[in-house]
């Protein structure tokens, strides 16, 4: 009688999580990279993380803003999204606010942009995980956090209710 003995390497691969498989294939562990970037930027031990069925969500304080980082998964079609709220709506002189935000989007926001989400003006950047490098992760988080921190107080002073 012959018994089937599965190849040990195949069995080991089958027990790896999708994050581990991605790291093995690309050499990048996105969760670890994000946590490293956040730990270097977060103030006063403010970083928090939660893991749900839709991925990982981090929150940390940077200057005067809270920054959120969401990683939906580890496949090429999953996304890394970073955002920070800078102003609640409605605002004073909204036409002038919209003009200012559009002008800043064109000249000052690099890969990020100002947007309106749930009646809040946010600085946001989002991209797929496909070919995402540790440097891009760091740059994206840094750009969003810095632009939000540099502009929130000015926008609130000028346009806040």
Segment roles from a protein language model:
Residues 60-95:
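The feature represents the first ordered module of a protein
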Residues 1-66:
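Charge-rich, low-complexity N-terminal segments
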Residues 81-120, 124:
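Short, internal acidic amphipathic alpha-helical interface segments
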Residues 109-142, 146-161:
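Well-ordered alpha/beta subsegment
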Residues 55-57, 77-79, 120-122:
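A generic structural signal for beta-strand entry/edge sites
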Residues 38, 98-102, 141:
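A generic alpha-helix structural signal
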Residues 49-51, 71-73, 112-115:
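Short, exposed beta-strand/loop patches in secreted or surface proteins that constitute
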Residues 26-33, 89, 93-97, 136-143, ...:
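Short amphipathic alpha-helical segments
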């Amino acid at each position: 009688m012959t018994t089937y003995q599965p190849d040990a390497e195949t069995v080991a691969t089958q027990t790896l999580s999708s994050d581990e498989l991605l790291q093995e294939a690309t050499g990048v562990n996105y969760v670890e990279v994000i946590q490293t970037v956040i730990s270097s930027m977060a103030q006063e031990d403010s970083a928090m993380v939660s893991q749900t069925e839709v991925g990982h969500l981090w929150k940390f304080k940077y200057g005067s803003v809270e920054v959120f980082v969401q990683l939906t998964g580890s496949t090429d079609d999953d996304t890394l999204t970073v955002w920070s709220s800078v102003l609640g709506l409605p605002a004073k002189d909204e036409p002038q606010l919209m003009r200012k935000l559009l002008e800043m989007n064109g000249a000052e926001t690099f890969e990020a942009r100002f947007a309106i989400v749930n009646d809040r003006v946010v600085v946001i950047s989002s991209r797929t995980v496909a070919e995402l490098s540790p440097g891009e992760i760091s740059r994206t988080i840094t750009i969003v956090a810095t632009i939000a921190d540099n502009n929130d107080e000015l926008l609130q002073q000028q346009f806040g209710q």
